[in-house]
Design a protein with these regions (language model features):
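Surface-exposed acidic, glycine-flexible loop patches that form ligand/cofactor-binding
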Residues: 2-8, 46-51, 114-128, 173-175
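Sec-exported extracytoplasmic/periplasmic mature domains
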Residues: 35, 39-43, 96, 112-120, ...
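VWA/integrin I-like adhesion module and closely mimicked acidic/polar interface patches used
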Residues: 136-199
Length: 229
């Protein structure tokens, strides 16, 4: 039998980032941590007698598809630490701008895109982790309709119920039920409250609505990630 302490985790992490006008702080935090991200996360995992065999990170950035032309920006998976430079360059290309005048953003659509990532199936133990940052409430998925970009329609759910079913029961997106984790940095508002109350394997850190998540730094985010793996 494999000893617990020798288990090696293959970790896929998808960072879902609100890149509307108020969110420059989080973009800078993620970029500044890129070089040491693997080492810092590995150190925190070692304290829990866990090891990372392979770490891949990708980004799904979002704005408001009802107000912004460039509403979703996706990267491929970058392997760490080898490709931290490419990851950092991608994050540096993200600009905090735009956002709908009505407040809500297209966060649930971005979460759906993240869930449909090309998740790893390799390794003794796997973790499929999504961490999402936003300081706004989400648009209802039911509102999307014809506004969903046609190229993305197959990966964006049309209702909160179907998104919930996919998280809890489905296998279409490739996330293993025992491996999936969701870490949310979002305000306690309608749209998020329903998700936090009903989704399993979900950790919520309440953010201040409209404040750009200024209260969070990468050290606390890394601690949360290590605890979720």
């Amino acid at each position: 039998m494999t000893d617990f302490q020798s288990l090696r985790y293959n970790v896929d992490l998808v960072m879902v980032i609100d890149v509307t006008g108020s969110m420059g702080h989080i973009i800078r935090e993620v970029r500044s941590a890129a070089i040491s991200f693997h080492d810092q996360l590995s150190a925190r995992m070692s304290e829990k007698n866990k090891r990372i065999a392979k770490l891949r990170v990708r980004v799904v950035a979002f704005r408001d598809m009802f107000a912004d032309q460039e509403c979703f920006i996706e990267s491929r998976f970058f392997e760490f630490p080898q490709e931290h430079g490419e990851f950092s360059a991608f994050v540096a290309s993200l600009k905090a701008k735009g956002g709908g005048g009505d407040g809500p953003e297209s966060a649930l659509e971005a979460l759906s895109l993240a869930m449909h990532s090309d998740w790893t199936k390799e390794g003794d133990k796997r973790r499929h982790v999504i961490v999402l940052w936003s300081d706004a409430r989400p648009h209802p998925l039911e509102k999307g309709g014809v506004n969903v970009p046609s190229a993305l329609a197959g990966r964006i759910h049309s209702s909160f119920g179907s998104l919930t079913d996919e998280w809890e029961l489905g296998q279409k997106c490739g996330m293993e039920r025992s491996s999936r984790r969701l870490v949310l940095y979002v305000p306690e508002v309608s749209g998020w409250n329903e998700l936090v109350e009903s989704w399993s394997q979900t950790i919520h850190f309440p953010s201040k609505a409209g404040k750009g998540l200024q209260e969070f730094e990468m050290n606390t985010i890394l601690d949360a990630l290590a605890n979720s793996i």
